[in-house]
Amino acid sequence: MAELHATSEPTTILTDQMLMRFIASFLAGIIFAIVVLACAGFVAVETGSVPANADGKPSALEEWAAKTALNAAIERDTKGLTNPIQPSDENLIIGVHLYAENCAICHGASDAKPSNPAQGFYIEAPQLAKDGVEDDPEAVSFWIVKHGIRFTAMPSFTTTLKDEDIWRIAMFLKQMDKLPPAVDAEWKKVPSAAGTPPK
């Protein structure tokens, strides 16, 4: 009668040893895949298969990595950052002049016509009179002007402009679409940066 109550273990249940083997094999497969991808990436870079030309279309991966890294860095570095320069016509006019001297060659004047260099940049330089950054916090514009953006034509002005002058540029950019009359008159005086197309 004892044999009637005996139960047998299902043969499909994994033992601890089999489970550990499965996990080890799975991890080994992941490591192998990572090594293969790293080697493929190295070969692609070494053989020139990764585009390095400024007029080449970036891959989706490159665009994602660049935008994600930039946005994360700006968000991290601008927390609690506020413009110490008081808004005034005088400070805005200084901002206009600083923009004209340092930025207009790439980002245009009030006519929003791009210069020849601006049309050849990767990424194409936005013409701020029409593709403005008025919606951005001043701290974001300050960060971009001060630090630049890697792998683009946007340079850093850390060594050439004082922080207070960068803040004046940021203030001007923030108010570009609603400038006081005296400031707008100065803005309209900035010479066009428009380039000449090839003949």
Label the predicted regions.
Residues 63-66, 112, 133:
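A ubiquitous short alpha-helical element
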Residues 120-175:
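Extracytoplasmic electron-transfer domains, predominantly the class I c-type cytochrome c fold
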